[in-house]
Amino acid sequence: MRWITRPGWPGNLLALAAGASTLLALAPFDIWPLAVLSIAVLYLGLRELSPRQAMWRGWWFGFGLYGAGTWWIYVSMNTYGGASPLLAIVLLLAFFAALAWFFALPTWLWARWLRRNEAPLADALCFAALWLLQEAFRGWFLTGFPWLYAGYSQLDGPLAGLAPLGGVWLISFTLALTAALLCNLHRLRPRPSFLAVASVLLLAPWGLGLALKGHAWTIPAGDPLKVAAIQGNVEQDLKWDPAHIDAQLALYRDLSFSSRPVDLLVWPETAVPVLKDQAQGYIDVMGRFAAERHSALITGVPVREEVHHQRRYYNGITVTGEGDGTYLKQKLVPFGEYVPLQDVLRGAIEFFNLPMSDFARGPEDQPLLQAKGYQIAPYICYEVVYPEFAAGLAARSDLLLTISNDTWFGKSIGPLQHLQMAQMRALEAGRWMIRATNNGVTALIDPFGRITTQIPQFQQAVLYGEVVPMQQLTPYLQWRSWPLAIVCALLLGWALLAGRIAKTV
């Protein structure tokens, strides 16, 4: 097994397989021990490599992770973006290759400055800190792509109880630390005191996670609210077709008119497929209907505004009836809602001319939505995958709401991964979440991240259920990731300093 730690294709191919196997730890497969195993394979594989060799080992791991975990983007490129199969594959491979550098650069840094083979305990701690750094970085750089975090594997696992303490990143840190410590236990046997410390660091987080699993950090702020979430199941190639807009508006109107009386009536992202000012008459009619039933209607709708004498378009949510507020999406999907370098790319390839791919970013510090006297934190599609961003809104809310249109990704695992991340946000915040989508999965999620009721994908239906507004803050909403970030910064700073001192002695 020495070839695992040595340079060459056998080790690189194993890293590729390890990265790909992470997919099986996440939804919909949920074989969570594979998250620890895949990280352990990468950690072991870096032990004897030069910085350049470690960089490529990390690159292959990242390529495997994204290649297996985000292949479903092909559906939006080919089926809805107009790219030929060959072009879609080429674009997708380039996408995987670029994202793989999120692992290549940290592994180069690890081998160049941070690796401490002579100090196995410190080495494991620093590796976990670096793992957290790379997850945070890939959720931030160039607006971020915070997908496939290792911590999501624990939504139903023993570490789920850590989510309200430090979010998904605390779980990812724990998984990386566990993997590295397991690899190093045999090297600590000659030093009983260090072995004892390592054993505590290995077992304590898992014990704490199990002990806190199911612990209620928040309490009800009022009586349960009755909810109806409509899943229209509109085909993506018809959604923005002017000839089918009236039929879509009629669909949501008729399903709402025939629904049971509820407190909150929720439609998915861009359920109203025309600009809000153009559809205001329709929205007013639906608002009067909702008010007559003592309901609040919440729907996705594109919004047009004049900003500094410039016309801008936003992906939005608006509330009418017994509620108020409009929210404009802040976290946009690259190439889906805006095109980087659009002067160069637009027109060059049909894929970059997708409908509604010229949205502007909504302003920060927007007020939350209000409905039935409660504050609702809104997340439009992609926004729910950003842990810190989501926590900022959740801390001011009584209830969470996410609306989405995952039709872009067809019958793939992408929407199920998206659902898992929404469940983690509910668990981190200790709040109920309403999830309304065009074609699934529409669901209600409790404060422990559990789905209480849902509609199967690709069905036109109305989901009924109850949610409870919650108050008080989980530790994660109070402190976010700052305590963990400080610990990791100290660990990495110590490793850098220790390495420099060692080289001068």
Curated annotation (Swiss-Prot):
It comes from Pseudomonas putida (strain ATCC 47054 / DSM 6125 / CFBP 8728 / NCIMB 11950 / KT2440). It is an enzyme of class 2 (transferase). It is a multi-pass membrane protein. Residues 230-469 form the CN hydrolase domain. GO terms for molecular function: N-acyltransferase activity. Pathway: Protein modification; lipoprotein biosynthesis (N-acyl transfer). It is found in: Cell inner membrane. GO terms for biological process: lipoprotein biosynthetic process. Belongs to the CN hydrolase family. Apolipoprotein N-acyltransferase subfamily. The keyword Transmembrane helix applies. InterPro entries: Apolipo_AcylTrfase, C-N_Hydrolase, C-N_Hydrolase_sf, LNT_N. GO terms for cellular component: plasma membrane. This is Apolipoprotein N-acyltransferase. Its EC number is 2.3.1.269. Coiled coil: none annotated.
